Amino acid sequence: MTSKTVTRADLASVVCKKVGLSHTESAALVELVLDEICNSLVRGEAVKLSSFATFQVRSKNERIGRNPKTGVEAPIPPRRVVTFKAANILKQRILDSHRAKQKKDLL
């Protein structure tokens, strides 16, 4: 498993190389897309990126949790969380890549 983390700058570099925009324009485009995704989620809208994933805001009820160090119970207040559900196409690409790597390692 790789430990590489893709950053905004990495995404901007890819856009710069593949689309032909300047690095500044590419960074602005990446920022614009990410801002729109965030704004949609803040408004409570689901964001579906076909063949990639769906991001959705979900409400979680209040519940009782436990401090792992002390074992003391404490209420966890209700909150809203973002969920990520990978599309089947993305899941399959990841699985295929994993299988190909395993096969290569066996040879």
UniProtKB/Swiss-Prot annotation:
GO terms for molecular function: DNA binding; structural constituent of chromatin. One of its GO terms (biological process) is regulation of translation. One of its GO terms (cellular component) is cytosol. InterPro entries: Hist_DNA-bd, Histone-like_DNA-bd_CS, IHF-like_DNA-bd_dom_sf, IHF_alpha. Keywords: DNA recombination, DNA-binding, Transcription, Transcription regulation, Translation regulation. Signal peptide: none annotated. Coiled coil: none annotated. PANTHER family: DNA-BINDING PROTEIN HU, INTEGRATION HOST FACTOR SUBUNIT ALPHA. Heterodimer of an alpha and a beta chain. This protein is one of the two subunits of integration host factor, a specific DNA-binding protein that functions in genetic recombination as well as in transcriptional and translational control. Belongs to the bacterial histone-like protein family. This is Integration host factor subunit alpha. It comes from Bartonella tribocorum (strain CIP 105476 / IBS 506). The gene is ihfA.
